[in-house]
UniProtKB/Swiss-Prot annotation:
Plays an essential role in the assembly of succinate dehydrogenase (SDH), an enzyme complex (also referred to as respiratory complex II) that is a component of both the tricarboxylic acid (TCA) cycle and the mitochondrial electron transport chain, and which couples the oxidation of succinate to fumarate with the reduction of ubiquinone (coenzyme Q) to ubiquinol. Required for flavinylation (covalent attachment of FAD) of the flavoprotein subunit SDH1 of the SDH catalytic dimer. It comes from the Eukaryota. Interacts with SDH1 within the SDH catalytic dimer. Keywords: Chaperone, Mitochondrion, Transit peptide. GO terms for cellular component: mitochondrial matrix; mitochondrion. Signal peptide: none annotated. It comes from Saccharomyces cerevisiae (strain ATCC 204508 / S288c). The keyword Transit peptide applies. Residues 1-35 form a transit peptide. Belongs to the SDHAF2 family. This is Succinate dehydrogenase assembly factor 2, mitochondrial. Disulfide bonds: none annotated. Present with 1080 molecules/cell in log phase SD medium. GO terms for biological process: ascospore formation; mitochondrial electron transport, succinate to ubiquinone; mitochondrial respiratory chain complex II assembly; protein flavinylation; protein-FAD linkage; tricarboxylic acid cycle.
Length: 162
């Protein structure tokens, strides 16, 4: 596999990326959160995902955790998810207990588009994993995403998180 793309392999290795040998034996490499493959027979319904292990935080004070989750809710990289999660966090984060904060933290470690599709109940595009099937937090996010008040979504002012 490394002989197929020697210059690319060296470049990606220098940047900390890994070339992964998929089940088909094709070369794959990451550019952000999207994967590219050398296999010309890839089907659109076959998704190769990147999984980066989240940083293990131990004994993180709740005020620091809330501040981090606010930041992570507001700065996702995809506008739709930024707007959805920032509004959700502004409304609910201050009321969450430690267990709910842990669950929300875990949700934020998922891919942006997956979060968006799960929140908008678009399971055909991104199937809901069993891990989230009975999540009260995800159900609350889905309800929030319905925008029953028909408000125009915008990034909440930081004072809304207090």
């Amino acid at each position: 596999m490394h002989n197929m793309f020697p210059a690319l392999t060296k470049t990606l290795s220098l940047q900390g990326y890994k070339i992964i040998n998929s089940q088909t034996g094709s070369a794959a490499w990451s550019c952000g959160r999207r994967w590219f493959s050398s296999d010309k027979d890839d089907h659109d319904d076959v998704v190769t995902r990147i999984k980066i292990a989240p940083i293990k935080r131990t004994n993180e004070p709740l005020d620091k955790k809330r501040a981090r989750l606010i930041y992570q809710s507001r700065k996702r990289g995809i506008l739709e998810t930024d707007l959805l999660l920032s509004g959700f966090a502004a409304k609910y984060l201050k009321k969450m207990n430690e267990e709910e904060l842990e669950e929300y933290d875990s949700l934020l470690n998922e891919l942006d588009w997956d979060i968006y599709y799960w929140a908008t109940k678009n399971f055909k595009t991104s199937p809901l994993p069993d891990k989230w099937a009975n999540s009260k937090l995800l159900k609350q996010l889905q309800e929030f995403s319905e925008n029953k008040e028909k408000e125009i979504l915008s990034m909440p002012d930081l004072s809304k998180y207090q």
